[in-house]
Amino acid sequence: MLRRLVQQWSVLVFLLSYSVPSRGRSVEGLGRRLKRAVSEHQLLHDKGKSIQDLRRRFFLHHLIAEIHTAEIRATSEVSPNSKPAPNTKNHPVRFGSDDEGRYLTQETNKVETYKEQPLKTPGKKKKGKPGKRREQEKKKRRTRSAWPGTTGSGLLEDPQPHTSPTSTSLEPSSRTH
């Protein structure tokens, strides 16, 4: 009885400690898959795109290898000094551009890649011309500050001049402002 109980417990502990695969993947693998960072997803996406691009290039290279060799043979038989007919143009035959797959679908038709413009150096900002309202306010302030006896004007007229030697003390009664 004890032996059977120990066997059942050991099997139970083994099954609980062993990670059961789910749909062919381990449980740890599923947990890791859910915790991937965005940068890791981008890296895997870029890696997949580059592998797909490489496979496509190999496929296209093997497909058009005979066409390239036939074109080279045909041009080598023509004399080097002969001129082409005036109505024909010698455009290189391109079956697929090297830029395919590197750009998004919106960018595939662009010939040049995006060039970054140089950054503007931060300089002094140009001050806008002050409006009429500001100029009028400045004029009012100037005229107010020129009036004698107003605070902030700097021109204070004392009704009694301080010429006596006793009025030089700093008593509050002798101050006028």
UniProtKB/Swiss-Prot annotation:
InterPro entries: PTH-rel, PTH/PTH-rel
Compositional bias annotation for Low complexity: 161-177
Skewed-composition ranges (Basic and acidic residues): 109-118
GO biological process terms on file: adenylate cyclase-activating G protein-coupled receptor signaling pathway; bone mineralization; chondrocyte differentiation; endochondral ossification; endoderm development; lung alveolus development; lung epithelial cell differentiation; mammary gland bud elongation
Superkingdom in the source lineage: Eukaryota
UniProt modification remark: There are several secretory forms, including osteostatin, arising from endoproteolytic cleavage of the initial translation product. Each of these secretory forms is believed to have one or more of its own receptors that mediates the normal paracrine, autocrine and endocrine actions.
Keyword Calcium: yes
Entry similarity comment: Belongs to the parathyroid hormone family.
The protein's name: Parathyroid hormone-related protein
Organism, scientific name: Rattus norvegicus
Name of the encoding gene: Pthlh
